[in-house]
């Protein structure tokens, strides 16, 4: 019954805890509920406990992100850059995208690297110099990322990312937490460069958001959580119609 009524959430495998409810006036609703109301507002209550530090929490209305919560702040100096390869050619067989990637700084130094969704021990990144690193990976609709911990990279210094799917050239002062994305065709094949703090520590977040309801327009509210290690979780939507 709970499954048929959408009172559940899904994860990519990690046992992420999510407790999400919608409060309209004094009544509480579970994820997946179909709600008709005369109220003008809904309060969305979200609690998340991750199995790894949290990178972001996205609040959706249908396909649209209405807010992104990042439980961390960036330092004044760039310390860590994440380069993400993602997407697929199309649904079904043959969707696999092969990536051949090189990342290079024109100033500063790459001190160390980390990986997300690199499961093949024979396909790990390799340094070619203290300013350049090379790797190969594949995606089939999901994402694969390499984190670079950098030193002395700032201002107009430039990061070059060259791949067989698309290339990027971006100044250090243009790399922020939201990221810069290069679309590469297919079904959401993309290359993204973003900045992260040196270390993420926050695994638990509790927030509440008051959202407006508009007469005759259905809101389809759900929450997506993304951890630093790439694992994600999604709730079923609330379907809320003011009438």
Language model features by range: what are they?
Residues 1-243:
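C-terminal functional module detector
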């Amino acid at each position: 019954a709970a499954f048929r009524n959408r009172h559940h959430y899904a994860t990519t495998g990690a046992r992420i805890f999510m407790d999400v409810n919608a409060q309209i006036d004094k009544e509480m609703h579970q994820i997946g509920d179909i709600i008709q109301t005369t109220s003008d507002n809904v309060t969305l209550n979200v609690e998340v406990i991750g199995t790894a530090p949290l990178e972001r929490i996205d609040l959706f209305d249908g396909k649209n992100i209405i807010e992104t919560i990042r439980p961390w702040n960036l330092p004044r100096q760039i310390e860590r850059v994440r380069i993400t390869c993602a997407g697929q050619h199309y649904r079904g067989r043959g969707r696999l995208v092969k990536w051949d990637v090189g990342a290079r700084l024109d100033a500063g130094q790459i001190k160390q690297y980390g990986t997300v969704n690199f499961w093949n021990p024979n396909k790990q990144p390799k340094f070619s110099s203290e300013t350049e690193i090379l790797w190969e990976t594949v995606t089939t609709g999901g994402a694969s990322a390499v984190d670079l911990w950098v030193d002395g990279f700032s201002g107009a210094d430039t990061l070059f990312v060259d791949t067989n799917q698309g290339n990027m050239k971006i100044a250090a002062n243009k790399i922020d937490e939201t990221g810069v994305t290069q679309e590469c065709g297919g079904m959401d094949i993309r290359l993204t460069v973003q900045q992260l703090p040196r270390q993420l520590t926050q695994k638990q977040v509790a927030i509440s958001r008051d959202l407006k309801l508009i007469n005759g327009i259905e809101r389809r509210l759900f929450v997506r959580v993304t951890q630093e290690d790439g694992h994600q979780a999604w709730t079923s939507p609330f379907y809320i119609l003011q009438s």
